Amino acid sequence: MASAQHSPRHSYDFRSEESISLGIPSPKLANIHKNYDRKIIILLIVTPICILLFTCIPVFVDFHGVAADIYRFSEPIISLPLQYNIMTTSEVFNDQTQEGRNFISGLTERELLNIWFLIGAALYAQGAGMHSTAIIAKHSIKDVISAHPEIVQQYPVINDVLYFFRHGLEHTTGHYIYAVGFVIITWAQMFAYRRQRHDGIDSLKGTLWWIAGGVLFGLLHGLVAIEFPSGPLVILIYVFLVGSFLTLYLYRFKNLFTKGRRLVLQSYLIGYTVALVIILIWIAAVRGIKDRNSAGLFT
């Protein structure tokens, strides 16, 4: 007797638009949506806080030694998993209907995003490592000069070496490799969330936390930019271009003025707006497009 033919079984994620449009009921749908969005908001708050703590404290607190070196080298180890978690919380990584579907050149969308993120993470870690190593070398040379001032007269080239580590590796090469990696990571996150729609935020508390995440993202861009050579000019152009693109994109899909319907994209747009305001205030305060060292602040 011929065996009964069974149609292939498909597993649907109840958050996906496809499962909702098919009318698949879920008694836990509302709670799951709420918890899912809460997780994203928490990540959007915690991630910039961690990066700010690791990047800003050494600027205002002058501490040397092994503890300071470990502190600086720890930043990518902590921040990169948080950055990755933001991306993998998107429905691209959680909707089972997306699994195995060819996206481009034989890669699934998840595979493409993982490769994309890893390229950014590699640059981010390399830049952070180069920056931290240059600081160690700079402090070591300064300590030698302080202990033996006569060495500069005997070996004037030591000033050139110090300049190379401070301005060549720390302030320019390390900073910009680090920043390019962060930009690539952020673009991977935005690409992962480009089609994703959320239920929106229905409480004042949730709205304030969500806005706080965007403000922190903007503070990160604004405060870090003033550390870079020509950083204020670079970030001014960057946030204007990317912010304009996000504005047009969200406006096109009628999500620009909603409360969290495009949770991540709107949060980043808030951040770029805050960063733009910070940089404009900075330029006005220092009377020009200067970084922190050029302005003579906290040097």
What are these regions (language model features)?
Residues V92-L107, Q189-L208, N255-K259:
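Juxtamembrane membrane-water interface segments of multi-pass membrane proteins
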Residues A122-M130, D202-Y238:
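Hydrophobic alpha-helical transmembrane segments of integral membrane proteins
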Residues D160-W187:
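Hydrophobic alpha-helical transmembrane segments
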Residues E75-E91, V180-A192, V239-Y249, A275:
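Hydrophobic cores of alpha-helical transmembrane segments in multi-pass inner/ER membrane proteins
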Residues L52, L220-T299:
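C-terminal transmembrane-bundle signature of multipass membrane proteins
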Residues I42, D69-P81, G127, T173-F182, ...:
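Alpha-helical transmembrane segments of polytopic membrane proteins
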Residues A2-V157:
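N-terminal topogenic module of multi-pass integral membrane proteins
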